[in-house]
């Protein structure tokens, strides 16, 4: 009764709990006093300063990098923390980096001088920008088709010195082992192929105008173009060398060249080119074993864009019909070339920018993993370009980055490709 009197008029919940839990008078009085205390107002502090990792994730999201890539790189927890900043611009990114490292920056951007100077003096800002730039450049590079990587062997070099590749003669083939178990020695020819990597790249500056304009995507468009340029530079190197016909690479002497009025692209000329390709010898020596066939098949049919449709029709047609006069028609009886070769068509082959270009010449290439006609090498096997920060000139209020790729292209085994002139 006394407990009921103490809690009466206040909280029926307390009375019920007191009965259920067997509170004494003292406990009941204490709980009533606690319940009667006024509730303190909630205190709302300022939002916590994001970490460098959260800012980096926010910058990735703002740059439009695919969500699965972001999740793989940062994890779900970091992405959740970065979500409120997913549309962060350059101004806010610069300011937040400065605050993280203890710099006092104005809340109002104004002319940006104080914020920009503080941000550019940090360690975190260039690191975040370098990360975002490398990712956007890599995505652009990987989205760009590179014909050279289909047609060439790909190797790795550890420095910029010239490296050598040797060709195994026909005398190096397997021979029957005598009853004594003695294996005969093969021989490497004196003929060797070389290659080396060089550096290709450009400089990119982030200056105060980019920060004031507050357009991260516009800045990253330049980075994306650097990625595309990296891909284009590989094809440019390859086609410049390839079309120049270095050292008479494609020639009758190498048994990999056809010309004449009957070599215009078509069924019969493709048959002739395939036959020439299939009859390549182990050579180049004069011994009987050097004249053994190597039995390598062409895999790629390489044509200029002017011939691309005809090549695709020939590869895709189940039948070929010839009229009474022997003239080929557009109507596709059995096609021996159907789906035999993978068509690779590039505008470089007929563009007058490249010496040796032709709108009529076409080629057959072996699988480069079997018999490479050309080789591409990358320094330490890194195929994609890379972006690094560099020191900006002292008279420049900005931040410098360099994008570059270390790559080399060189002709290798002439037996790995055939050129057909396509005309007399």
Question: Where does each model-flagged region fall?
Answer:
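Secondary-structure capping and boundary motifs in well-ordered enzyme cores
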Residues: 24, 121, 192-196, 215-218, ...
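Assembly/oligomerization interface modules of large self-assembling protein complexes
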Residues: 110-200
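Short, Φ-rich (hydrophobic/aromatic) sequence segments
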Residues: 119-142, 222, 313, 361, ...
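Short, solvent-exposed loop/turn segments at the edges of secondary structure
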Residues: 197-201, 296, 396
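Alpha-helical scaffold segments that mediate packing/assembly in large oligomeric complexes
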Residues: 202, 206-221, 225-285, 338-340, ...
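Sequence/fold signature of self-assembling virion shell proteins
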Residues: 260-268, 272-283, 299-300, 306-424
């Amino acid at each position: 009764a006394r407990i009921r009197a103490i809690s009466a008029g206040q909280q029926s919940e307390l009375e019920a709990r007191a009965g259920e839990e067997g509170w004494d008078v003292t406990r009941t009085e204490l709980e009533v006093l606690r319940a009667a205390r006024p509730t303190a107002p909630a205190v709302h502090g300022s939002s916590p300063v994001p970490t460098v990792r959260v800012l980096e994730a926010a910058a990735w999201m703002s740059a439009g990098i695919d969500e699965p890539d972001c999740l793989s790189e940062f994890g779900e927890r970091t992405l959740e923390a970065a979500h409120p900043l997913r549309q962060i611009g350059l101004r806010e990114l610069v300011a937040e980096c400065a605050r993280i490292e203890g710099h006092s920056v104005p809340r109002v951007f104004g002319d940006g001088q104080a914020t920009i100077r503080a941000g550019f003096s940090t360690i975190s800002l260039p690191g975040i920008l370098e990360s975002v730039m490398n990712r956007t450049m890599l995505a652009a590079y990987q989205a760009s088709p590179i014909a050279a990587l289909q047609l060439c062997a790909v190797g790795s070099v550890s420095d910029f010195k010239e490296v050598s590749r040797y060709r195994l003669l026909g005398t190096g083939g397997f021979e029957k082992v005598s009853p004594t178990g003695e294996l005969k020695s093969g021989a490497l020819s004196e003929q060797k192929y070389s290659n080396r990597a060089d550096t290709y790249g450009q400089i990119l500056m982030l200056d105060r105008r980019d920060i004031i304009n507050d357009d991260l995507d516009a800045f990253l468009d330049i980075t994306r173009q650097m990625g595309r340029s990296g891909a284009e530079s590989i094809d440019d190197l390859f086609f410049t060398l390839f079309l120049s016909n270095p050292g008479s690479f494609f020639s009758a002497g190498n048994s990999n060249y056809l010309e004449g009025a009957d070599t215009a692209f078509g069924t019969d000329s493709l048959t002739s080119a395939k036959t020439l390709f299939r009859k390549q010898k182990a050579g180049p020596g004069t011994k009987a074993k050097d004249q053994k066939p190597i039995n390598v098949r062409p895999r790629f049919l390489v044509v200029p864009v002017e011939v691309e449709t005809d090549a695709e029709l020939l590869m895709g047609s189940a039948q070929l019909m010839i009229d009474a006069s022997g003239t080929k028609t557009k109507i596709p009886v059995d096609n021996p070339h159907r789906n035999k070769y993978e068509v690779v068509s590039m505008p470089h082959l007929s563009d007058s920018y490249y010496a040796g270009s032709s709108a009529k010449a076409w080629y057959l290439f072996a699988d480069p993993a079997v018999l490479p006609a050309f080789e591409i090498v990358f320094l330490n096997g890194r195929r994609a370009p890379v972006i690094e920060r560099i020191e900006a000139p002292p008279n420049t209020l900005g931040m410098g980055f360099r994008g570059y790729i270390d790559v080399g292209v060189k002709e290798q085994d002439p037996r790995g490709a055939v050129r057909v002139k396509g005309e007399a």
